[in-house]
Every structure is written in structure tokens, then in C-alpha cells.
């Protein structure tokens, strides 16, 4: 029987007071009964708008219909045809601005909880599936993938399903890219990422860690000396941006990238860590995206008494996912919106002791269509903080550009590609943050999927 409730089933979660002191996953996931009930809210539209909002084009109505019938493994098989990372996507994709944002049920009520259902199905499969993954028959062609983030994993998975011999080259000691070094355990457990990677390995994908492409091996060497017929660059965007204001070199100033990498990958909060993070009482995180929310919530879990999100626009302009903002508010993060830093203050030891700011007000729209923040006269203030984390986005590392002859990039470092993901170098494709700069996991996955199709077509035409 259809469920015509205007509200989606709420996601069970840890209590905010409890979770703000641990790194366990905040959202605990739907039960079977909740998932089936939520799936019955889907109208199974003849022209499903939700699918047009999905970067990897999952057949959403079909998988949800199968959930409603309690055919969870069949639902998983529908999802996995389009997405190599369903357990990841169900947790971190911005569904409210993609598939769920176009759901018809959202016109007069809340949209169907597509992301939560995708997560449920993937988790159910990981817990209950008994049949081993069938390894596709090899087609005899080799492809290299640079980077093991969402773009690289998706490209590798799609190519492996087509029979390609795929090797992923990862610079760090763990595979997963931003999924493991950038997103905290409480939002995306590392065990979930590892299970997704294990699934790709079962398809025949090889993963080589501690391989810095551009240093260990160049792109040209992969093709000319190692026999790869095509290369996909999905190396992400790990070069942090700063404001270039006075005081950014003080002790206690971090990029969000460094702060999160130390916590997520190196466990820098442990007393015996070789890359320790100074525990702070009052922390300011500059920025308003998902990464800023992650950094702020990590600082809180490390024992900070006050954590501020400092953002130059208003609450309604925050680019972070609605759920992440709500979780941060529930945990006690303080939002200082319409506020912009002008200087970081230091004491006699060169350590952060405050941050000068000015209040902002919204003026006329800028090129992005959002109202441009302008300084409010005579509005200077000082925040009493001993740590500042800059979360202002990232750009691609220039190493691959510098070591790949003929590779064209934008002035800010993004690799230039065509609609198939092809770069200016024959047989070399790229996608994800290495092309766009900081973007979402799902958009990176979509780019990896596009490039995989382009690589397949390229190699077929070479035969």
C-alpha cells in the first residue's frame, strides 16, 4: 500500500551531546521497516525527474520499487550498474540539490529520501551478500588511473566491468583519496570506503599505493614504458587556498586540508602521534562548505570549548549540505555569518591569540548570481581564538601539469578536457576536482563515468 505521508522517515542518529565527544558515525541508518515504508512514498513517475539530477544516472524508481518489495539485493544490483560507490554516495552526496531536489513528492511536502535508501541498500548488501563478485573476462587492454578518490574509483570500476586490466596509482599509503583523508569517520567510516574498494579489487582492479605520479612515474612513462593504452587523471585538488591576510603564518593556523588529513589519516589527536595537532580551546573555521563543517565538528570532538564558523555571506547562502549544517548546529557549533576575517593576531611566541574581522552586508548580485557581500562601515570586531582553520577551497597540485608534456590547463591549474573527458594529450583523460577544482563526490563520480566511456570508445577505435 502506498505511503502518502508528506514527510520522509527521519534518519536515526546519535544524540548530539553524545556524538560531539566521539568519532562514531552520526547517522545510524534506516531499519528494514523504515526503508520499506520510505520506499512506498515513491510515486514511480513515468518521467522520473529525479534521475536527471543524478550525476551517475542510477535508475532510481526501479531500485526504490524493489526496496518497497523487500527485494534488497535486486535493488543493489540496479544501483551497482550505474554506481561503483553506493554506500559512499548514500552518505555524502548532496541529494537535496540533485536527485531529491527534483523529486515530485517535494512539491507538496518532503522528497523521497533517495540517499538514505541508497545507503540502506548498499549496507544491506555489504552485510548479507554471500555470492562472490564475478570477475569480467579480460579484453586484453590496460588502463592506468591516477588517484583513488571518487573519480578514479568510478572510472576504474566502470572500465573493469568492461574487461579492462585497470591499475590505480595512489600517492598516499591508503586508497580512497578524499574519501579517507578529507571526510571524517563520523560522516563516512573508513570501513565503508574499504568495502567499496574491496569490491573493485574483486573485479580485478589493482591498487598501487605510495606512487606519486609525476615523481615515481610520469604520465608519459605509464604509456610509453609500462604499456598502458590510456590514462585517467583523477588526482583531485589538494592544494589549499588562503586569504593572504596578515598572520596566516602563525602557529595554530591550518588549512582545512592539512587539519583533516592529520586527523583522518594520521590520528594526530592521539598523544603519541608523530604529526600532532595542538589542542585548542577556541577555534575559528573560515568558510561555509562541507569541508568547513567537517573541520569545525572535528575541532569540537578534539575538546574545543567554542568553535566558530566564520562566513562572509548569510546562513541561507552556506554551500554545505543542509544535513551537515543542521548536525553542526545541533552539536553547538557557533555560526558567525556575514563576518569576514581581516587579520590573524599572534602573541609574543608567534601563536594565534585572536582574529580581527569585519561585519558584512549583502549588496548587488555578483557573477555567480548571489548577492555580493560588502563591508559594513565601522563594524570591526575581534574573535578570541587560539586556532584558525582556513577552508576556502583547493586547487589541483601542479606536479602532473609540470611533468606531462602538452597537457593544457586553466590559469588556476584545472586540467582542460572535452565533453568526453579527453585532455590535450592523446589517450589521456581527466575528471573530478583535478578538472573542476573543489566539487562534490557525486560530480566527481559522474566525471569518472564519462571518462570511462570515452576511454572505452578511444581504445575500441584504435583496434
Residue positions per predicted region:
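Ferredoxin-type iron-sulfur electron-transfer modules in oxidoreductases and energy-metabolism complexes
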Residues: 19-37, 59-91, 108-135, 263-264
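Local cysteine-cluster metal-coordination motifs and their immediate loop/turn environment
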Residues: 40-59, 84-107
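Feature captures the FAD/FMN-dependent oxidoreductase FAD-binding
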Residues: 74, 137, 142-146, 194-245, ...
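Glycine-rich dinucleotide-binding loop and its adjacent helix/turn
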Residues: 121-137, 195-215, 240-302, 409-424
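N-terminal Rossmann-like FAD-binding beta1-loop-alpha1 element of flavoenzymes
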Residues: 141-167, 292-300
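Rossmann-like dinucleotide-binding cores of NAD(P)H-dependent redox enzymes
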Residues: 165-168, 172-202, 207, 296-343, ...
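FAD-site-proximal beta/loop scaffold in flavoenzymes
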Residues: 249-280, 365-438
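A conserved FAD-binding loop/helix module that cradles the flavin
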Residues: 434-462
Amino acid at each position: 500500500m502506498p505511503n502518502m505521508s508528506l514527510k520522509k522517515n527521519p534518519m536515526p542518529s546519535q544524540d548530539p551531546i553524545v556524538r560531539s565527544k566521539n568519532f562514531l558515525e552520526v547517522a545510524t541508518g534506516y531499519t528494514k521497516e523504515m526503508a520499506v515504508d520510505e520506499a512506498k512514498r515513491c510515486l514511480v513517475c513515468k518521467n522520473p525527474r529525479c534521475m536527471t539530477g543524478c550525476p551517475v544516472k542510477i535508475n532510481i524508481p526501479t531500485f526504490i520499487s524493489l526496496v518497497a518489495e523487500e527485494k534488497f539485493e535486486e535493488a543493489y544490483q540496479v544501483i551497482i550498474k550505474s554506481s561503483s560507490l553506493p554506500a559512499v554516495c548514500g552518505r555524502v552526496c548532496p541529494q537535496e540539490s540533485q536527485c531529491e531536489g527534483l523529486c515530485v513528492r517535494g512539491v507538496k511536502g518532503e522528497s523521497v529520501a533517495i540517499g538514505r535508501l541508497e545507503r540502506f541498500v548498499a549496507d544491506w548488501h555489504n552485510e548479507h551478500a554471500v555470492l562472490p563478485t564475478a570477475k569480467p573476462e579480460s579484453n586484453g587492454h590496460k588502463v592506468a588511473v591516477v588517484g583513488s578518490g571518487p573519480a578514479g574509483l568510478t572510472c576504474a570500476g566502470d572500465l573493469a566491468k568492461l574487461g579492462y586490466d585497470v591499475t590505480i596509482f595512489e600517492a598516499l599509503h591508503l586508497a580512497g583519496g578524499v574519501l579517507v583523508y578529507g571526510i571524517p569517520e563520523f560522516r563516512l567510516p573508513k570501513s565503508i570506503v574499504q568495502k567499496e574498494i574491496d569490491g573493485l579489487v574483486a573485479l580485478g582492479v589493482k591498487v598501487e599505493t605510495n606512487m606519486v605520479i609525476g615523481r615515481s612515474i610520469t604520465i608519459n612513462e605509464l604509456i610509453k614504458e609500462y604499456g598502458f593504452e590510456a590514462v585517467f587523471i583523477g588526482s583531485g585538488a589538494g592544494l589549499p587556498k588562503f586569504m593572504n591576510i596578515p598572520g596566516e603564518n602563525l602557529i595554530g593556523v591550518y588549512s582545512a586540508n592539512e587539519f583533516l588529513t592529520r586527523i583522518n589519516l594520521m590520528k594526530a589527536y592521539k598523544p603519541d602521534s608523530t604529526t600532532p595537532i595542538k589542542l585548542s580551546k577556541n577555534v575559528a573555521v573560515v568558510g561555509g562548505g562541507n569541508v568547513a563543517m567537517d573541520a569545525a565538528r572535528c575541532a569540537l570532538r578534539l575538546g574545543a570549548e567554542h568553535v566558530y564558523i566564520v562566513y562572509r555571506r548569510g546562513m541561507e547562502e552556506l554551500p554545505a549540505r543542509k544535513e551537515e549544517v543542521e548536525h553542526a548546529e545541533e552539536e553547538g557549533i557557533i555560526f558567525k555569518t556575514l563576518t569576514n576575517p581581516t587579520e590573524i593576531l599572534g602573541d609574543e611566541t608567534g601563536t594565534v591569540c585572536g582574529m580581527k574581522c569585519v561585519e558584512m552586508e549583502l549588496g548587488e548580485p555578483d557573477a555567480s548570481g548571489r548577492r555580493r557581500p560588502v563591508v559594513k562601515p565601522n563594524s570591526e570586531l575581534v574573535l578570541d581564538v587560539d586556532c584558525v582553520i582556513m577552508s576556502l577551497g583547493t586547487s589541483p597540485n601542479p606536479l602532473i601539469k609540470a611533468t606531462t608534456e602538452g597537457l593544457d590547463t586553466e590559469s588556476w591549474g584545472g586540467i582542460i578536457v572535452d565533453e568526453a573527458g579527453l585532455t590535450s594529450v592523446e589517450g589521456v583523460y581527466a575528471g573530478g576536482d583535478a578538472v573542476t577544482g573543489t566539487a562534490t563526490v557525486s560530480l566527481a563520480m559522474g566525471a569518472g563515468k564519462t571518462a570511462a566511456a570515452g576511454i572505452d570508445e578511444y581504445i575500441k577505435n584504435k583496434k
